Amino acid sequence: MSYLKSVDEIRSLIAKLKKGNTLWLDTEVADYDTRNPRLSLIQVLDDCKDLTGESVYILDVLEQPEIVAEFIEEIMINSSIEKVFHNAKYDLRFLGKKKAQNVICTLEMAKKIPYYILPLPNYQLKTLAIELCHFQDIDKQHQSSDWGIRPLSEEQIEYAYLDCIILAQVHSRLLEITQQTD
């Protein structure tokens, strides 16, 4: 897992990510329950087979609107890169809105699978991860923590990088289930 803060580090990573085919993404937002939410982190995984976190990049973009704009321009609007989110509608509020291209949402994928095939009480990422991928001990308590303070706690950073790994595994299982039902 790489935690990147400087514009140069993030810019370098964007150049690398532009060459990829699929990215699994998540965001953490400071002040999410106010009128002025602020994008704090962009988490990116570029290898769905990675369960260790070595291919996860955490981009600390709090108060760096210029690098967020660059990420949107180079990654989010780039239609040749598939971008996978859970609840993409929320993340896209901060990452290009309707300009974003080639976006896949695992929440929407799960909802389209008939209930008799995927009988779940809800389609939260945690539920999908436990039921489809047999993940254990998924702690979501840091989801609503204060993403606007620095430095972030080790627990916040761990939560942030695990979400991408979980997302990629859930996406993979949903693709398998979808192919079986077609």
Segments the model singles out, each with a brief description of its role:
Residues Q180-D182:
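Short, intrinsically disordered, charge-balanced linker/junction segments flanking boundaries
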